[in-house]
A protein has these predicted regions:
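Iron-sulfur (Fe-S) cluster-binding segments and ferredoxin-like electron-carrier domains
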Residues: 27-36, 310-325
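Accessory C-terminal segments flanking Radical SAM cores
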Residues: 191-315
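Core AdoMet radical
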Residues: 9, 29-38, 55-68, 84-104, ...
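Distinct, well-ordered alpha-helical segments
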Residues: 72-75, 98-111, 165-173
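Short cysteine/histidine-rich metal-coordination sites, predominantly Zn2+-binding motifs
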Residues: 37-46, 319-332
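Classical nucleotidyltransferase
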Residues: 125-231, 235, 240-241
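Canonical Radical SAM [4Fe-4S] cluster-binding loop centered on the CxxxCxxC motif
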Residues: 2-40
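Acidic (Asp/Glu)-rich catalytic clusters
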Residues: 49-52, 80-81, 108-117, 141-144
Length: 335
């Protein structure tokens, strides 16, 4: 049976709900995703499987982990109990916004994190997040981290000179930022980030492909490629979601139970996964065509973009390895 082998480095996604729906979000998180948070039993099982798979350190992400602070603390404690090092916790800093009800208790939360041994935050700050969180909030959180002794890093600090042209106390629309920066700030930000065009970012690749990055190509250009997609079991930067699904790096929207990624994947159980893993885009296209897929006559900017749309189509056919919500949410918010 196939398995992921040693789990080298990963993240635990404690939820999918977020206060933002960023254009580059690989996991298609948003304010309208389910409001649940990983429960204790699932988190305990995740920790056990991570240990079994050889993983000794993780970060915590989402969604937005700080939407349920008590739930976050519970996960931190379980990781510590399992002997798994917590590297950092990701946040968009919404809870440090001067207008947020949570603002009053920020320092108390930071001190609580320190007491639990969770001493580092990864604080998001960039033009995409600025559509949903005033960029002053990450800066305010960073300042409070310094006062309380919590380590942090701004992801990505390089955008601060650009953002300084905006009002730090309010969010900004695409139209505002295009007028302030340029008509191509979305594409320029993606290039500066070095992002992969998965999740909601498939829209960035498609919108700007003809103008800046080549052209749209017919599906026929890509479907003869039989190279297997072994990235589906890559463990260099995998994630485990709140339902204990293993999610490979970059190829989001595909999921298999973490227990099977660790112990072995039964043959024949996941046709979409097996098609991609063994026969690449060619095999996946064949599977989709058999079920009625018609390629977009306008074309696709890349093989991976075509793959996303093939999986989106197949996600409506009840394949358990495909997260239908991921594809719907990826296409829902981009405008």
């Amino acid at each position: 049976m196939l398995s992921a082998g040693t789990l080298i480095h990963g993240g635990v996604m404690v939820n999918y709900r977020c206060t933002a729906a960023c254009r580059h979000c690989l996991y298609s998180c948003s304010p309208t995703r389910g409001s649940g948070y990983v429960d204790k039993e699932t988190a305990e099982n995740i920790c056990r499987l991570l240990r079994t798979g050889g993983c000794r350190s993780v970060h915590i992400g989402g969604g937005e982990p700080f939407l349920d602070f008590d739930g976050l603390l519970a996960v931190i404690r379980l990781l510590r109990k399992a002997g798994i090092t917590l590297e950092y916790i990701e946040t968009n800093a919404f809870w440090a916004d001067s207008n947020a009800p949570e603002k009053k208790g920020v320092q108390d939360k930071l001190k609580h994190l320190l007491s639990e041994g969770a001493g580092t935050l990864c604080i998001s700050v960039d033009p995409y997040h600025a559509e949903y969180v005033p960029y002053g909030a990450p800066l305010a959180l960073a300042e409070l981290c310094e006062k309380t002794g919590v380590d942090y890093f701004l992801w990505k600090r390089e955008f601060l000179p650009v953002l300084s042209r905006l009002d730090s106390k309010k969010v900004h629309s695409r139209d505002e930022m295009e007028k302030t920066f340029s008509d191509t700030y979305i594409y320029d930000t993606a290039r500066s980030y070095g992002i992969g065009y998965g999740g909601r970012a498939v829209n960035i690749e498609r919108e700007f492909s003809t103008g800046l990055d080549g052209a749209l190509y017919p599906a026929e250009k890509f479907i003869t490629d039989t190279a297997p997609c072994h990235n589906l079991l890559s463990t260099g930067h995998f994630h485990v979601d709140m339902y204990s699904y293993f999610i490979p790096p970059r190829c989001t929207g595909i999921r298999i139970p973490l227990s099977e990624a660790v112990d072995g994947i039964p043959g024949g159980k996941y046709p979409v996964f097996e098609a991609l893993y063994s026969g690449g885009i060619s095999a996946l296209f064949k599977l989709a065509r058999e079920q009625g897929f018609s390629p977009d006559e306008a074309g696709y900017p890349s093989k991976c973009n075509l793959c996303f749309h093939l999986r989106h189509f197949l996600s409506e056919k009840n394949y358990s390895e495909l997260d239908r919500n991921h594809y719907e949410e990826a296409l829902r918010y981009y405008s």
